[in-house]
């Protein structure tokens, strides 16, 4: 029997795939638990429609992320922090601080999206990576000045 998986099923396939399984397995396990649908014409059309809709949403999301990446790359944040004589900061600037500054600038960025190897502890220019999608990131310039 051909079925369309609604969820990922270990050993069978991923959600959205059309697979062949034994009739009993489909009737007694997959269908009652809501893991699959019978692959009839109606359900296949619905699946195609959902795939197209998902692809359009992914494309729009990618375009939005690319425009945000472009704006972030052009942006240079200036952060004022207290520093000692040797240009060392009292405290440090973390991903959370950068995320808050970006939110004040109008960017909805979570601190988990900011890739910073270690907190910034010195005055000067620094470059931070902001991960927007799994394969798209932007370089953000941060200028730390002493108060």
Swiss-Prot record:
Molecular function in Gene Ontology: rRNA binding; structural constituent of ribosome
Top-level taxon: Bacteria
InterPro entries: Ribosomal_bL9 (IPR000244), Ribosomal_bL9/RNase_H1_N (IPR009027), Ribosomal_bL9_bac/chp (IPR020594), Ribosomal_bL9_C (IPR020069), Ribosomal_bL9_C_sf (IPR036791), Ribosomal_bL9_N (IPR020070), Ribosomal_bL9_N_sf (IPR036935)
Keywords linked to the UniProt accession: Ribonucleoprotein, Ribosomal protein, RNA-binding, rRNA-binding
Pfam families given in the database record: Ribosomal_L9_C, Ribosomal_L9_N
One GO term describing the cellular component: cytosolic large ribosomal subunit
A biological-process GO annotation: translation
Function: Binds to the 23S rRNA.
Family statement: Belongs to the bacterial ribosomal protein bL9 family.
Family matches, as NCBIfam families: L9
PANTHER family, per the entry: 50S RIBOSOMAL PROTEIN L9
Protein's UniProt name: Large ribosomal subunit protein bL9
Native source organism of the sequence: Thermodesulfovibrio yellowstonii (strain ATCC 51303 / DSM 11347 / YP87)
């Amino acid at each position: 029997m051909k079925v369309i998986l609604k969820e990922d099923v270990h050993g069978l396939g991923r959600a959205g795939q059309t697979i062949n399984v034994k009739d009993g397995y489909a009737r007694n396990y997959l269908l009652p638990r809501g893991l699959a649908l019978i692959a009839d014409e109606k359900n296949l059309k619905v699946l195609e429609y959902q795939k197209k809709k998902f692809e359009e949403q992914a494309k729009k999301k990618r375009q939005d992320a690319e425009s945000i990446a472009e704006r972030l790359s052009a942006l240079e944040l200036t952060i004022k922090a207290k520093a000692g004589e040797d240009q060392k900061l009292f405290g440090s600037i973390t991903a959370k601080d950068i995320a808050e500054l970006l939110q004040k600038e109008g960017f909805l960025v979570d601190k988990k999206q900011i890739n910073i190897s270690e907190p910034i502890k010195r005055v000067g220019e620094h470059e931070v990576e902001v991960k927007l999608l799994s394969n798209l990131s932007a370089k953000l310039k941060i200028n730390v000045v002493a108060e």
